[in-house]
Structures are given as C-alpha cells and as structure tokens.
A protein has these predicted regions:
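Active-site neighborhoods and metal-handling regions in enzymes and metal-associated proteins
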Residues: 1-376
Length: 376
C-alpha cells in the first residue's frame, strides 16, 4: 500500500526532528489526516468517519509512534511505522488518551498545530483531559511542520505531474463531453467519469459554473439547468493520485462566445503568462500577488488570493495574497489562479499548477488555450 519508499518518510521525519531540536520541542502530536499520512504513509478513506480519533507522535529521535484505533492496525503495519499502539474504538471513556499519556511521558514542550489552516481532530473535552494528565505543555509547531511540507521531493513532484496529466487528458475531451442542452449536473457527472477513466484514483473535488457570458459562482453544486448557446462553462478539478491533488480549471464557450467573455479570457490568459514568465525563487507570495493583481488593474476580484500551495491537500500553505511573506523556494508546488469580475456580476477564473525551479517555473499542467475555446 505504501506510496513511497521508507527513505522518503525517514527524510521527512529527520527534517522535522532537526527543526524540533532547534526550537527545543520534545515531541510533536499530530491528529489530522494530511499530517498523519505525510509522516507515516497511512492512506485511507476511513478518515471520512469522524467517530474515531487517530494520533501520531514524532519524538526527538527515531521513528514516529502511531496511537490509533485497532481497526487501523493492519494498514498501519504495512507502512514504515514499527511502534503501533491501539485501543478498541469507539470507547468514549478513553479514546486513546491513556496511551497518549504513556507516549508523552517526560516531554516538557509538546508541539501541536495551532496556526492558520490547522484544526484539532479530537474532542476538545479529550484534549483538555490529556493536558490535565501530562506534565508537559503544548506549543504551536505549525512553522516546524510547514517548513518541511512546503518543499516537495522529486518523487512527490512526479506524482503531481502525473495527476495533472490525467486532468489534462480529461479536459482535452471537452468537445466530446459537453453540448448545448446538456444539464449542468450531467456535464459534471460526465467529466468526473472521464477523470476516472483517464487514471484518477479519486475525484473528491469538482466545482465550476456556467452562465451567459460568464458565471456568478464557482462553489455551488451544479444545477439541472441546461447549457445554452452563449454560456461560459468552467470546470475546476481536484483529482487525486496516490493521495496527491491537481487543482486547475478550464473555460469554454458553448456555441458562440461574446466579445466581453473573449476579453475577460484573454486578459486572464495574458496575466497568467506574465506570472509564468516572471516568477522566480526568492520572490515572496505577496510580490507574486501584486504582480498579478496590478496587471489585472487592481481590485478586479474580491476572492482574496491569486493562488496557493498544493500537494496532499487540495489547498496548502502558503497563499499568494497580501501580507504573506513566505519566500518561494525551489521544489515548492503552487497554483497560479488569477480571477476577475466583469459585466453584471460575472466572473472568470484561470488556474495553472507550477513547480518553482531555478529560473522560470516548471508548468505541471498543459497550458490553457490562448483564445477562449468554443464547443460547437
């Protein structure tokens, strides 16, 4: 089941432990799916159930320790983890707390994710109980974890390239999939099937919109309203391969394209091209945001950011936005996602996935057509 060789997980763990040493952190407690998977290789859709908590502790030295419900023992044993401690769950009176107390014994400064984009995937009541039973105190380890997860290995980048290729091939079939009169929810369904046919393992994220000359919303479930001549259809997919996401979209006109839609598309294509030409290691996320936003004319969208990190999550730290001073470094994988508002409440979004390299970034997605494609 394991998606990488043991050396991949060993390197990730050692990098974090080096950061722990530098910050006087004795142990790190992880309880969220992306972090547990990142450091162990434990990949399962069973996380969809909120009933059972799952824990991994990274000590100062050695391999991580898994403290998990017994139902996950066999799968965890197929990863590189040796120390697996389990309990019969659900068990409301003790959902792994006594085991955590044992593992964390002697740790004075315990890291846990507290920063932006973090969450606590255990009952708050249990967390308070855990704090009362240990001698150590908890501190924010978000920067320690993010510092490692920001930089992708070449093996991770290859998987990201492959899932982008799956979506590329699926988008290339648009002329055979979509047509005037087709209900929007049917278009979504056909595209999801196509993604699976082309090699995606899962399609956990597929959003989009459609409307005359543009769309007004990109996060609602698709309606049964038929596509009409003059509509702009946009689909944005976060499909996965070995648990890694692509995240990009494509736009098409149905039948005919209005001048206003063509102009919006052309503007977004050109500003994306500018970003692809200008982005370099050493730039901050804020600088990239300003580069894109200024070329769009400023204030053209209220979405708040023009891209983000991507990897084992659909959206990862950092964000291409104001006040994000994260410095771009080689092997970071991010999206470039300019958007603009126009007409009577209409909007359009373009998105590509890139890897930061020495010099110009590497485009992981097949570049969108220079002119708005028309499906006839």
């Amino acid at each position: 089941m394991i998606d990488f060789e043991e050396t991949e997980f060993q390197l990730r763990t050692e990098k974090v432990q080096k950061n722990m040493f530098e910050n006087n952190v004795d142990a790190i407690l992880l309880c969220t799916e992306p972090e547990v998977r990142y450091f162990t290789g434990f990949r399962s859709l069973f996380w969809q159930s909120p009933t059972r908590p799952w824990f991994v502790v990274i000590p100062k030295n050695g391999k991580p320790i898994a403290i998990i419900p017994d139902i996950g023992r066999d799968l965890m044993a197929r990863t590189w983890i040796d120390d697996i401690r389990t309990w019969p769950s659900p068990r409301r009176e003790d959902e792994g707390i006594s085991l955590l107390v044992e593992v964390l014994e002697g740790a004075k400064n315990i890291g846990i994710l507290m920063g932006e984009e973090a969450s606590l995937r255990m009952p708050l009541e249990d967390f308070e109980k855990l704090k009362s039973k240990i001698d150590g105190t908890f501190s924010d380890c978000s920067k320690i974890i993010k510092k490692v997860r920001l930089i992708k290995s070449e093996k991770e980048i290859l998987i990201l390239k492959n899932i982008c290729s799956v979506a590329n091939r699926s988008f290339d079939r648009a002329n055979r999939l979509f047509f005037s009169g087709q209900p929007l929810n049917e278009a979504f369904r056909e595209f999801k099937i196509t993604l699976l046919e082309e090699g995606a393992e899962e399609v956990p994220y597929l959003v989009g919109g459609a409307g005359r000359d543009g769309y007004v919303d990109v996060i609602s479930p698709p309606s049964s309203k038929p596509l009409e001549n003059g509509d702009i259809l946009m689909l944005d997919t976060g499909s996965t391969l070995k648990g890694y996401f692509c995240d990009f979209d494509r736009n098409w006109a149905i039948g005919t394209a209005s001048d206003i839609a063509k102009r919006a598309y052309s503007k977004l294509h050109k500003v994306t091209e500018l970003a692809l030409d200008e982005i370099r290691p050493g730039m901050t996320c804020e600088e990239v945001f300003k580069l894109i936003n200024n070329d769009l004319g400023g204030g053209s969208s209220n979405i708040g950011r023009m891209g983000h990190g991507i990897g084992i999550q659909l959206t990862e730290y950092p964000s291409l936005m104001l006040n994000d001073e994260t410095v771009l470094k080689e092997n970071m994988v991010i999206t470039i996602e300019p958007s603009m508002s126009y007409g009577e409440g209409l909007m359009m979004v373009h998105e590509e996935n890139i890897c930061i390299r020495d010099g110009k970034p590497e485009l992981l997605t097949k570049r969108a057509a220079e002119e708005l494609p028309i499906i006839r």
